[in-house]
């Protein structure tokens, strides 16, 4: 693929005859330092280091700004970082492309007025209606200081990471597998929102497509055998809440897949949903050319309830493995994949994954426990971080297995890692921390399995919500 790149624009005072010449090395030094900072610290969602493009020349006026823009146009530059230690000619040197994301780093030094250019160019951007981010260091630096201060580095990396995420999602698709689940407002896919705010196309695939592919064998049969063997070896079964229940006939006769064949069916479901999103060259070899293409997805969701789950195994395993940073093929990029096709949750998961590099965990906000309620029910009052009460987030069965926190960082603390840092030991630990319980037939007549695990703490968590009006 052609990766979305960050363009570095070194702007300079254009006065030849001593001024410009004295600034060339420092200005280009800032640009190369920023380029190295980004490329050494940031990754695309597929694990590849983020790529930067350096302007072929410092930019002292409109002619060089145009030359830089022309060069960037052929490099798939989605964002620009303008850097300077000095005064430059505001609107003559700025990035005027309305389609790029912009930031400006003005050097905090006394010898040259980098701050003046930063203020002037930000004013120019505001007057032109072009959003831009201002980056300036807290402390004055010596002109000869080639180090990027920590506070500036953090701002540059935040900007570049978010900009690369925007470039990554552009022109990709959110794939709705099914429609609206149980009247959930978030399941109403707003195609205009996806296009206008995220540059993403919305696509719909009826859930019968999964049945068609299972029936006609439109999946990689060798991979299926590998995947099913992996599932049986690594996905231990937990408790069965249906045991001993006298279930009504309407529930008993609704399960059309034999319980002993649930895992095989679910494994096929998982492979097929992945293939729908991303395509699979193996299908092309099998003669299924259209199916091999996929949907160029960046995220998706599965309706499930109730048109599917009232008679077929649920997709909790599918959703959990899609969102996890590993499967039977080893470590992989996690897929933001929304339970109940809650598209707003799907977008929140996507944004979180793009800027963190880690798997998205889909939880239910189940209860709020006040200190008084804890005291009444358990006889004990919460202490420490929970002393004022806490919100109970529960894994309803479809959360990424990374959410167990079974991975460990260099200090031995529970954590979640970008998939490219996952080890075989991390993967095994997540699998060992999880068991798979039979779905409650009163809710899921078609059966299936739901993940069950306890979180490892302490570790930081970030909660993401998305609302649309």
Q: Locations of the language-model features?
A:
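An N-terminal assembly and electron-transfer interface module characteristic of large anaerobic redox
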Residues: 1-469
């Amino acid at each position: 693929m052609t990766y979305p790149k960050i363009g570095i624009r070194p702007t300079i005072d254009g006065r030849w005859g001593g001024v410009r010449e004295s600034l060339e090395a420092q200005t280009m030094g800032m640009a190369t330092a920023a380029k190295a900072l980004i490329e050494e610290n940031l990754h695309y969602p597929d694990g590849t280091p983020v790529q930067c493009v350096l302007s072929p020349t410092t930019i002292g006026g409109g002619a060089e700004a145009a030359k830089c823009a022309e060069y960037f146009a052929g490099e798939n530059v989605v964002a620009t970082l303008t850097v300077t230690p000095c005064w430059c000619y505001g609107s003559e040197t700025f990035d005027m492309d309305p389609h790029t994301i912009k930031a400006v780093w003005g050097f905090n030094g006394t010898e040259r007025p980098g701050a003046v250019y930063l203020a002037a160019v930000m004013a120019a951007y505001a007057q032109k209606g072009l959003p831009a981010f201002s980056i300036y260091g807290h402390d004055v630096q010596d002109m000869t200081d080639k180090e990027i201060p920590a506070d500036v580095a953090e701002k540059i990396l935040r900007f570049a990471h978010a900009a690369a995420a925007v470039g990554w999602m552009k022109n990709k698709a959110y794939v709705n597998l099914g429609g609206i689940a149980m009247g959930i407002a978030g399941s109403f896919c707003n195609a205009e929102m996806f296009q206008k705010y995220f540059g993403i196309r919305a696509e719909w695939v009826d859930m019968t497509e999964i049945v068609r592919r299972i029936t006609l064998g439109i999946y990689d049969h060798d991979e299926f055998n590998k995947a099913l063997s992996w599932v049986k070896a690594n996905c231990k079964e937990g408790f069965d809440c249906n045991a001993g229940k006298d279930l009504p006939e309407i529930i008993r006769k609704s399960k059309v897949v034999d319980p002993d064949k649930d895992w095989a069916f679910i494994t096929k479901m998982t492979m097929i949903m992945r293939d729908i999103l991303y395509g699979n060259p193996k299908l092309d070899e099998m003669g299924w050319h259209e199916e091999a293409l996929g949907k160029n997805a960046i995220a998706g969701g599965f309706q499930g309830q109730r048109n599917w789950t009232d008679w077929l195994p649920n997709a909790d395993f599918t959703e959990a493995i899609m969102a996890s940073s590993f499967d039977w093929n080893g470590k992989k990029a996690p897929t933001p994949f929304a339970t109940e096709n809650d598209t707003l949750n799907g977008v929140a998961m996507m944004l979180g994954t793009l800027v963190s590099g880690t798997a998205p965990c889909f939880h239910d906000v189940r209860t709020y426990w006040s200190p008084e309620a804890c005291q009444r029910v358990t006889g004990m009052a919460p202490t420490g971080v929970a002393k004022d009460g806490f919100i109970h987030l529960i894994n309803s069965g479809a959360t990424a297995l990374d959410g167990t926190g079974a991975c460990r960082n260099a200090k031995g603390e529970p954590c979640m890692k970008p998939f490219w840092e996952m080890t075989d030991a991390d993967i095994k630990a997540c699998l060992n921390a999880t068991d798979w319980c039979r779905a409650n037939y009163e809710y899921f007549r078609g059966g299936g399995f739901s993940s069950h695990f306890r979180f490892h703490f302490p570790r930081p968590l970030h909660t993401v919500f998305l609302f649309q009006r």
